[in-house]
């Protein structure tokens, strides 16, 4: 059985879906005001890998990942560029889809956009006001955190702790609130900002309400898994839980999953340190499959360190797997031996999607394959395991001239003309084709 580390309970829990063999997942997507950075990519790859493993285990996955296209950062960037917020969002949504395609990300079941859910957002906020969980203040609408049961439990905090931290705050917005911790569900319109009409006057939604509405509209009041980066535990996911459960009276998500951060050369990635790396720029020099492999093979909850050496190692390891995949098939292999690798892989991945252990099994299997165990059944199993990591290798097709040289070398060896055989071997090596003579015949890899 698959076990998931649930952030809410801080424990490993058996995964039991609401509906048998179906997984409903909502993963917070990017705010589309710029190209995604390597930290965004880490989250996208981590949850794509988790989705792929669920599918490997036979589940049908409804995978929802949103685009936040109404936000302070988008408004600021659009104003600076002299274009509409929609034009800016459209540009960076297209860039996101292009970049993530190069990372081997499967298309989501749906990618909802905030601008398409404005009526539903207004209705959601109205319900919270009617139930006494929200109040209007000068055109803004705030959520009453004091009415929320176990507020901030997800972040392992108490309301009392947070109130102590918030004491002494004073600004125009705080003065409008009943409690400094109350958060905005709806923001009154400001000059030069996009807005929509509402019962409280023109304005736009707060950040947290957007995900609650899109998740529940598409997947229902309770979902199986809600995921995102560790930075979203508080306040974003905390506030999603508070407002969603206040509206429905039901558990919002049964499992909460959060991926770890990305450091660059052992330092936190930030613009101020000058180590901020976008995927758009990275893909100019690094193959998307290599970057994917680096990100996918680290255990998703742990921080990872992005370095040139780490990328080089990923490239070397991926090349080894590719060469293994391209080996010619052998005679029938012991299915019992194959099963030991399949069982070990499942055991690793069932343990909270431990890709670090899973990829170790993959390399053990590759070593076994290279020792002459590669029939069609083994190849199919190897490919399915690779696909969990988002890796798909195209079949290598040798040029006719190279195939002819290999055949000529085989003939020369059969005739004990070893000088000719060695000459052809050297000629092939110069073209990047490495030959290996085995009991099952000649095998080749491309350097």
Predicted segments with their positions:
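Alpha-helical recognition segments enriched in aromatics with Gly/Pro capping
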Residues: 1-33, 48, 98, 119-327
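N-terminal, positively charged nucleic-acid-binding surface of large information/translation enzymes
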Residues: 9-12, 18-104, 440, 444
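Short phosphate-binding/catalytic loops that engage adenosine nucleotides
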Residues: 59, 133, 433
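Short, glycine/charge-rich beta-strand/loop segments that flank catalytic centers
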Residues: 67-71, 93-96, 106-121, 139-148
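Short, polar/flexible loop-turn hinges at active-site or ligand-entry regions and domain interfaces
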Residues: 81-87, 108, 301-305
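Non-catalytic interaction-recognition regions
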Residues: 97-119, 233, 288-290, 295-296, ...
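Structural preference for alpha-helix termini/caps and helix-kink/transition segments
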Residues: 268-447
């Amino acid at each position: 059985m698959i076990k998931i580390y649930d952030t809410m309970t801080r424990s490993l829990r058996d995964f039991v879906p609401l509906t048998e063999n179906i997984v409903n997942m909502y993963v917070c997507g990017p705010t589309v005001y710029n190209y995604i950075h390597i930290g965004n990519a880490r989250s996208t790859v981590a949850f794509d890998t988790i989705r792929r493993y669920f599918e490997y285990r036979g589940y049908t996955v409804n995978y929802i990942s949103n685009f936040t296209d109404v936000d302070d950062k988008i408004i600021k960037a659009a104003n600076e560029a002299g274009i509409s917020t929609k034009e800016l969002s459209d540009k960076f949504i297209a860039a996101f889809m292009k970049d993530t395609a190069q990372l081997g990300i499967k298309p989501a079941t749906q990618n909802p956009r905030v601008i398409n859910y404005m009526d539903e957002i207004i209705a959601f906020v109205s319900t919270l006001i009617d139930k006494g969980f929200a109040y209007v203040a000068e055109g803004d609408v705030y959520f009453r955190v004091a009415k929320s049961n176990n507020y901030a439990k997800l972040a392992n905090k108490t309301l009392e702790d947070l109130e102590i931290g918030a004491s002494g705050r004073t600004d125009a917005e705080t003065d409008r609130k009943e409690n400094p911790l109350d958060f905005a569900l709806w923001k009154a319109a400001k000059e030069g900002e996009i807005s929509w009409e509402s019962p409280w006057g023109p304005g736009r939604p707060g950040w947290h309400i957007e995900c609650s509405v899109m998740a529940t509209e598409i997947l229902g009041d309770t979902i199986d898994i809600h995921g995102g980066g560790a930075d979203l535990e508080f306040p974003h996911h905390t506030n999603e839980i508070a407002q969603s459960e206040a509206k429905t009276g039901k558990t919002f998500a049964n499992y909460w999953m959060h991926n770890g951060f990305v450091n660059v050369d052992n330092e936190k990635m930030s613009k101020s340190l000058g180590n901020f790396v976008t995927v758009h720029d990275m893909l100019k020099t690094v193959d998307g499959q290599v970057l994917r492999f680096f990100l996918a093979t680290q255990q998703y909850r742990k921080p990872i360190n992005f370095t040139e050496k780490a990328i080089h190692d990923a490239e070397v390891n991926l090349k080894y797997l590719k060469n293994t995949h391209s080996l010619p098939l052998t005679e029938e292999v012991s299915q019992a031996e194959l099963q030991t690798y399949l069982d070990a892989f499942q055991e690793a991945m069932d343990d909270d999607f431990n890709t670090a252990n899973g990829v170790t099994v993959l390399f053990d299997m590759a070593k076994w394959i290279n020792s002459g165990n590669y029939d069609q059944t083994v190849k199919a199993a190897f490919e399915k395991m690779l696909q969990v990591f988002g890796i798909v290798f195209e079949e290598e097709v040798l040029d006719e001239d190279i195939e002819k040289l290999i055949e000529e070398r085989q003939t020369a060896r059969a005739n004990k003309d070893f000088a000719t055989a060695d000459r052809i071997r050297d000629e092939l090596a110069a073209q990047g084709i490495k030959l290996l003579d085995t009991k099952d015949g000649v095998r080749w890899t491309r350097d």
